[in-house]
Amino acid sequence: MTTKKYYEIGRKKLFKLNRSLTGDGNRKTLNIIKSEFKEFKIQKIKSGKKVFDWKIPPEWNIKKAHIIDKKNKKILDFKNNNLHIVGYSQPIDKFLKKDELLKHIHSLPKQPKAIPYITSYYNKYWGFCMSHLQKNQIKKYRKDDKFKVLIDSKFNNKGFLNYGEILLKGKSNQEILISTFICHPSMANNELSGPIVSMSLINHFR
């Protein structure tokens, strides 16, 4: 029953949170895990800090994003699926013609119903992800049709990267490290399966 409990936490609470390398969604995720284990510690590292061969990126958060056609119909809304936005997209708020918009739309022709997961952590870029079926619907619009494009995202150079850790002491000084990622949103493998299994293991060994 305990494993089922953590499965339900993942399904009902973690799956819907938008997460990336940094941001509010990560903190919410870690706080949900902490609510289950008081020994769980949430740590933070400042954006810009050098960690081995990596530099902590600016904190990225997004409030909303959508595409609206000439009839004021919302043909894509970030609220419906976290995968609809390229991770770490730059903000944009403008009208674009069809061909220009299509340059920033990603899909999977061989999996026409699936939404791809795309990121652009280190290159300044913005983009949308949708099923290939959705993309084909946009292609049906006239060449001169314009679309209202909005990505309300922000970068904070004074932000943080957050991570969580817990140490369960055993009978010896030897350690076994178990790690999991939380940075990919709305996917079962492994940014949902990882935290669920990790919570189950914490409960089992403590």
List where the protein language model places each region:
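N-terminal hydrophobic/helix-forming segments and targeting peptides
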Residues: M1-R206
